Amino acid sequence: EQYFWLTIPVKSKGKYNQLINQVEIDYSKDPFEKIVKILKHNYSRCKYYSEIIEILEKIFKKKILYLSELNILLIQEICKFLKIEGKKFIKSSNLNISSKKGQLLFDITQMLNGNIYISADGSGIFFNNQNPFKDTSIVLKYHNYDHPKYKQKSKKFIEYCSIVDLLFNEGIKSRKKFKNYEI
């Protein structure tokens, strides 16, 4: 009945200013062995454990070099499992844009012909009091997350766990938690 952090070790020595797409996973020890043990300990009695751990272990065995690539693959595989189809993933590193912070977000939205940029609530500090979306046709919306409740193994519901928690507990039924969701 407690939450825990799952972390993946990365190579960081002398790499303080690296871009997110340059962060390498540290394979000097098996970075996923501990994660799988923690997941087994905490979720093995969940109804959908076998199904979800199989997806995760398949991904972990791929020896993906960069953390961003691992994140992308995890998102894609979760979308596939939940039958969320027709979504295109575009890496900002492939767009040849050199601006920074809030301006970068605006430039990406504009380059992709977006008319709305959805930002996490509380991320206004990222714009440093200079809102590049102001006085443009692109609308900046702040996403205020209202956490859905679902059946968990614990007696008391623990909010703000990752989608992995939801998947272990609800499996494909997790789709219902997103069906009527609006921003």
Protein language model regions, located:
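Residues lining hydrophobic/aromatic ligand-binding pockets adjacent to catalytic sites
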Residues: 1-183
